[in-house]
Structures are given as structure tokens and as C-alpha cells.
Amino acid sequence: MTPSPPPITYISIPLPTNDVVSRSIHNLTTAISSHRPWSELIFSGDFSLPESFSSLLLRSKTNFNYFFVNYTIIVSTCAAFALITASPVALIVVGAIIALWLIFHFFREDPLILWSFQVGDRTVLLFLVLASVWAIWFTNSAVNLAVGVSVGLLLCIIHAVFRNSDELFLEEDDAINGGLIGSNLR
């Protein structure tokens, strides 16, 4: 009997903080660039009332999945406009906190290294939560931020409910079955 080889494991090589931030920013720009064309969101497709409640749910789910990045941009823009009305300082502070969340939590792939120590995910999350609470308290912008996000969500929900999603295809199989593209398999 031969001894079994040791299991193959993935070992993460710590990267400097600059590399972590630049990779996170690259991931963020890649995610934002995956939005659907704005003309497709607004002008193409007809708007109508859903025929039934199940049709409403299906239409909403399809539109939310298809236009997710666009809807995120709309909600973020409404929140930014609400913060501008509060004060420019609030917009800058909350914008900086949102940038920290995007870079250090949502789009970070590698461990964060500060002063030759690896910072754990829970520590990063705790710091981001505390910084967010401090920023909202410091700028007194909780109400304005809630109003802006609510208006953005309301706009997205209205669009998702009334935009006909019959011609939207989320996957290639759906496009083939719907007759949008032909299949080479015969």
C-alpha cells in the first residue's frame, strides 16, 4: 500500500494594503460596468399593469434581477441628492463611509494587512459598522438618508412592477426558448 498524498489546500498569500484596495476598486468598477443600458431601462419595452398577482411577482423578480445594478445606482443617486439637501459635509462623510464599505467589505477578495498584521473580517466589519453609526450621528443625516433611500426604492419598485419583462432574458437557455437566439444543437 502506498501512502495517500497530503490533501491539496489553498494558502492565501497576504497582499499589501495598497494591492487590496486597488483590487477592491477594480472589482467595484467591474460590477458597476455590468449595468444594463439606460435606454433599455427607460425607453424600450412597454409599460402596463400586471394581469395578476403572480404576474406582478414574476415581473418584479425578473426586472429586479435584470436591472439590479441600475436600480442600485438609482437608489444611491436619490440618497446622494437627499444628503446634498442636508449639507454638503453630510454627503462627503457618508460618501466616504460608503466607499469604505465597498472597498473593505463588499469587493475585497484578499486579507487586509496593516503594519504586518492580518486584520480579521469581523474586525473590519465592526470598524465599518461603528464608522457608519458615527457618520450618521455626526452629520445628523439619518432622516434625510432614509427619505432618499425610500424615494429611490419606491421609484425602482414602480418601474419593476409596471415594466413588461416579456422580452428580458436572464440566461441563454431562456433566450433560446423564447426565440431570441437560435440553437446550433440539432
UniProtKB/Swiss-Prot annotation:
Expressed in roots and trichomes. One of its GO terms (cellular component) is endoplasmic reticulum. InterPro entries: Prenylated_rab_accept_PRA1. One of its GO terms (biological process) is vesicle-mediated transport. Keywords: Endoplasmic reticulum, Membrane, Transmembrane, Transmembrane helix, Transport. Belongs to the PRA1 family. This is PRA1 family protein G2. It comes from Arabidopsis thaliana (Mouse-ear cress).
